[in-house]
Amino acid sequence: MRIKLSVNSEKCRKKAMQVAVAADGVTSVAMEGEFQDELVVVGDGVDSASLIMALRKKACHVTLETLEEVKKPQVEEKSITPHCCIAQCPVVSNEQPRPEVYRIVHDSYGPTTGCLVM
């Protein structure tokens, strides 16, 4: 929806933007035009009559220029060709496994049969 504003000050533009953003269903609001005097409102289920009345009451005199449905761009589905599958080869290692090393610890004092405290 494109709304023509008759505003001369930045304060009125800000107020008009605030009123438009507060409306139900509005998803985006932008100022366009040579003199930043057109308010572009995009949304789902926006009531244009109530928005125009709210803008006239709270901001300034406005007129509705265009009201149109925003159409989503059509995306052409391209046929997807499957890519050739590349076989993954397993990793082969020529390295020999390392032998396990065990360390044997001997008690130099021998088995104790009693109290060692003297």
UniProtKB/Swiss-Prot annotation:
Residue numbers of Cysteine methyl ester PTMs: C115
A Gene Ontology molecular function term of the record: metal ion binding
Lipid-anchored residues (S-farnesyl cysteine): C115
Keywords, comma-separated and alphabetical: Lipoprotein, Metal-binding, Methylation, Prenylation
Keyword Metal-binding in annotation: yes
Propeptide: 116-118
Protein's UniProt keywords contain Metal-binding: yes
HMA domain span: 1-67
InterPro entries from the UniProt entry: HIPP47/16 (IPR042885), HMA_dom (IPR006121)
PROSITE patterns from the UniProt entry: HMA_2 (PS50846)
Similarity comment: Belongs to the HIPP family.
Purpose of the protein: Heavy-metal-binding protein.
Name of this protein: Heavy metal-associated isoprenylated plant protein 47
Organism, as annotated: Arabidopsis thaliana (Mouse-ear cress)
The gene coding this protein: HIPP47
